[in-house]
């Protein structure tokens, strides 16, 4: 395959990203502290802390293997002419432009899924199983994979078909039309996800009447939060790990509590967690997140429309017959490093939002200690990293390290 300047730029950018990931991974392992921080005395015992250190090392090593595998697959497919070979195969079916594009992009997606499946199986049934987290049966795992593939085929295929048609026929402003369409679909999906998507994978039940529901509803009322529903999700079907999150907008918005969270925390702690989630809404973090996602879509489509019409992009990947669908596929490889930069910005914003929601919850409930205790228990039960390296936090973390959050709540941060 012939090379050009863009070939070397893209190759070096992706190799550089891999090296940065490797350095961050190693630094994160070196940052592990053999002694338990004082704030967590009485939360972890010695055996639990040893287990945390082993789990962090195991997951870090697995991440390094996964990153190496991903890079090897990309380089092998790219340098052996895979993008052009697949293009010639789908063109030989003599279908229309949209169908050919969907077959090409769908083939890439399916191939990536197949090659990533062994790693996902190993992570679920070896690493998570070894440390007592996994509750997923092979049947549940297989069902989740099939559902995910079908959702990707139906929803992803429909969106891709529209994007391909718009970019093909929309002229110079096509990216704007595609951006508008994708933005509307994003908002619709955020609205419909609680009713249509989440129930496909998990059973959602209303929180039963009792002290916890009364306290949560009273807290929501005090904070002026029109809570449509408090749902308990059967997260224990798949893992012992716990979480809570806010989902939906408008009339579909709800707070979702994992059943493992409800089981392991006091009423005060759960009310504080709920207040934290309400804080994201009251402080308009949800709106900012949606706006940020829409801006990212716009940046992607603007750059994509500009670059997929450049012959040098196709030459860099050995694609002999330019097309919009092949252009989008190879542009994704170029966009990866840029996406990492945008991800760093989004991560910094997200961590600020978490601190702000913590402050909101502490002030609104007068229970900073309860939220701090909830964070400590979550970290212990999930074996979360108490002291990740700063570079690792900057590159990957949407939440601040739990130790920093606890210290901020205790007035020590």
Predicted regions and their residues:
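Polar-ligand-bearing catalytic/cofactor-coordination segments
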Residues: 3-322, 336-413
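Glycine-rich, flexible loop segments associated with nucleotide phosphate handling
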Residues: 323-327
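Alpha-helical transmembrane segments
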Residues: 330-334
């Amino acid at each position: 395959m012939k090379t050009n300047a863009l070939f070397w730029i893209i190759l070096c950018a992706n190799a550089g990203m891999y090296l940065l990931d490797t350095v961050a991974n190693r630094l994160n392992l070196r940052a592990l502290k053999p002694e338990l921080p004082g704030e967590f005395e009485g939360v972890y015992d010695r055996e639990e802390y040893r287990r945390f250190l082993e789990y962090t090392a195991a997951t870090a090593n697995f991440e390094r293997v996964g990153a190496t595998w991903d890079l090897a697959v990309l380089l092998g497919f790219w340098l052996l002419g895979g993008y052009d070979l697949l293009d010639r195969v789908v063109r030989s079916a003599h279908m229309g432009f949209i169908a050919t594009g969907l077959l090409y992009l769908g083939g890439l997606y399916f191939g990536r899924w197949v090659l990533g499946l062994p790693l996902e199986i190993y992570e679920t049934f070896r690493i998570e199983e070894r440390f007592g987290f996994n509750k997923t049966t092979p049947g549940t795992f297989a069902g989740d994979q099939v559902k995910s593939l079908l959702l990707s085929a139906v929803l992803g295929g429909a969106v891709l078909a529209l994007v391909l048609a718009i970019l093909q026929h929309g002229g110079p402003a096509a990216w704007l039309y595609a951006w508008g369409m994708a933005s509307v679909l994003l908002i619709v999906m955020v609205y419909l996800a609680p009713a249509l998507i989440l129930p496909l994978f998990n059973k959602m039940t209303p929180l039963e009447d009792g002290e916890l529901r009364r306290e949560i509803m009273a807290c929501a009322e005090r904070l002026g939060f029109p809570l449509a529903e408090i749902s308990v999700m059967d997260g224990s079907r798949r893992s012992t790990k716990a979480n809570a999150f806010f989902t939906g907008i408008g009339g579909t918005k709800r707070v979702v509590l994992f059943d493992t969270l409800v089981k392991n925390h006091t009423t005060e702690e759960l009310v504080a967690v709920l207040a934290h989630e309400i804080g994201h809404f009251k402080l308009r973090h949800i709106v900012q997140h949606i706006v940020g996602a829409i801006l990212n879509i716009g940046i992607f489509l603007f750059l994509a429309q500009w670059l997929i019409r450049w012959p040098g992009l196709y030459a860099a990947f050995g694609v002999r017959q330019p097309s919009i669908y092949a252009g989008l596929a190879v542009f994704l490889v170029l966009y990866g490093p840029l996406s990492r930069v945008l991800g760093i910005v989004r991560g910094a914003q997200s961590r600020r939002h978490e601190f702000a929601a913590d402050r909101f919850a502490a002030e609104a409930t007068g229970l900073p200690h309860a939220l701090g205790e909830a964070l400590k228990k979550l970290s212990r039960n999930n074996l979360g990293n108490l002291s990740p390296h700063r570079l690792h936090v900057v590159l990957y973390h949407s939440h601040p390290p739990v130790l920093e959050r606890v210290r901020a709540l205790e007035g020590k941060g």
